[in-house]
Structures are given as C-alpha cells and as structure tokens.
C-alpha cells in the first residue's frame, strides 16, 4: 500500500476541501484517464483496490499511472477511550482529492478495454468519476 517513507510532521490537521483541483487536471502521461467529480479523502487501500481491479482486467497489456498519492495521515483514538489526553495515533493515509483531479491514467490498450478497466476501478472508489480521453486521441 502507498504511504510516505518519512514525513516532516507525524500528525496533521484535517483541513477543508474547498473548491476545485488547481493542479493535476490534465491528462499528461497516458491516453485515457479517470477524473474525480466530487471532493473526498481517498485511502491508500482504495487506491490499491482500484489499481488491482484495473490490472486484473487489462492483464499484461498497457500501462497504468496513479496520479494521486496518500500523503496525509489520519489519526484515530482507540475504542472505548475517554476524550482528552491528546490526539490519537496515525491509523491510515489518505490522498485529498478535489473535483477535476485526474486520479488514474492508462495507455497501450483499446478504448473499450480502458473504459471497462476504469469502470471497475471507479466501483472501488467512494466518489463519482468520469472517463476521459486525451483530446488529441479522440475520434
């Protein structure tokens, strides 16, 4: 699963997911892409599940790029613990995804295969997504 090797701060504040994505909104590496239409925290497990679903369908054909990385630690206090006594320990990692962000890219397969692979990947994610074809490859 994806997580940073080392971080400057072990615990971070939750923050707000306002507005649309400022960067990572264009298809850069591949021909096809999966774009987020809603804001969400995508966990490293969800990213991995989507990656596995795409790889299983595409088999050995094509190449996949993961354009998001879970670099935000989410803390959690143990069950049945009284409130107070500090912030909990980091439990899992999330990627902050805003609307318009390209999450996955692929190339080297037909559009039908890519569409189905991204549809399977989208089922593993907790947000609405859209399949995109790079503008110069449409038609």
From Swiss-Prot:
CDD domains: Ribosomal_L16_L10e (cd01433). Keywords: Ribonucleoprotein, Ribosomal protein, RNA-binding, rRNA-binding, tRNA-binding. The keyword Nucleotide-binding does not apply. Binds 23S rRNA and is also seen to make contacts with the A and possibly P site tRNAs. GO terms for molecular function: rRNA binding; structural constituent of ribosome; tRNA binding. Belongs to the universal ribosomal protein uL16 family. SUPFAM superfamilies: Ribosomal protein L16p/L10e. Gene3D superfamilies: Ribosomal protein L10e/L16 (3.90.1170.10). This is Large ribosomal subunit protein uL16. The gene is rplP. The lineage of its organism: Bacteria, Pseudomonadati, Chlorobiota, Chlorobiia, Chlorobiales. GO terms for biological process: translation. Part of the 50S ribosomal subunit. It comes from the Bacteria. One of its GO terms (cellular component) is cytosolic large ribosomal subunit.
